Amino acid sequence: MTYGPARALPGDQIQITTNPDTEPFWLAAKEHKLTACECGACGHFRMPPTAVCPECGSREKKWPTLPGTGTIFSFAICNKNPKNGEDYVYVPVVVDIDGAPGTRLNANVSGCDAEDVHIGMKVVVDWTPIQDGWALPNFRKA
């Protein structure tokens, strides 16, 4: 089956909320920088960020800037806009994030045909402007 170009979801339809654990991620994203929560005590990365490290119980956090690259771990091809049901090809992905061992990020991939997306595909972060001046990390083929 041929789906055609994979697109990012329309940014005007996406809104986020932050909390003390996620706000550093979203503030970095607003500046088009990819980061992940790293334990300041043991170095364990975790996404989504949590108040306490699941490995050692520490509350210390670091937010290193990551290279913005990764590898597709999993994906699905969708052909309907989830908000209004209109025809719209998009590809949600789970990406293993480079520079943060064990960290995976849910996003979308765009800039290629949906049928060309595959597990193991190298990707680079691409930013989608969304509501309230925030930016959403998505990916495109590297």
Residue ranges and their predicted role:
Residues 1-34, 100, 142:
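A broadly conserved sequence feature marking short terminus-proximal activation segments
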Residues 47, 60-62:
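Short functional micro-motifs and their immediate structural scaffolds
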Residues 48-55, 122:
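Short coil-to-beta transition motif at edge beta-strands of beta-rich domains
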Residues 62-71, 117-121:
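Short coil-to-beta-strand transition motifs
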Residues 105-142:
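Well-ordered alpha/beta subsegment
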